């Protein structure tokens, strides 16, 4: 509990049970129900998104992708797009939790049967979403937090392994302020990736060392399209707030020469879709 508290998690109860006698099971159930009642759920995005963890072909059906639905809902017959390849197709069939389904929604395990798509065009790490709403990128502004127990140091321009959703991508961490990041420290960086990823603002990710592979840090996406003159991007990234609402206001001021509609801001802040209108009013 102390370990979780130090890392921003609300510690829940620890329950001792006996599978043979059943002792403690009822207390565990009661504590689980009580915990569920106090957990605050974030407003989910209305846009569908699913990170693909498996791709395979089945005789008589064709290509199937599986994953856990992160946001939104889709139904049989809907048009979707698969990123970063930007392949558009329709849903031929759906399965969820072992049975056929007409639709799947946030939290469901889903198997999506795709129409007229070859298996070799897709891979683990792809993202299934609605057409034209996501943009793959190789330049990302992030905040990195080092694991407190690691002996590793992240230095400027260091090559690392980044895990976004179900994908692993190699890339380099470019410093905006500190030349190195040590255990327990955090700072804003610009990631320059070797292949495109499909992510959104406020997505979390894990960083592993290139070799030997060890988990050394985690992070959050602050802005997903850090293109432009390096000196300008560096200053832009260095001052970018971690808090979503503060970052929203920061971006409005910074991008004031390129006005966006409310819908554009909703797409940009994909995970905070339902908060954007409220932020505008505030």
PLM feature segments, named:
Residues 2-150:
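Conserved catalytic-core segments of large NTP-driven translation/proteostasis enzymes
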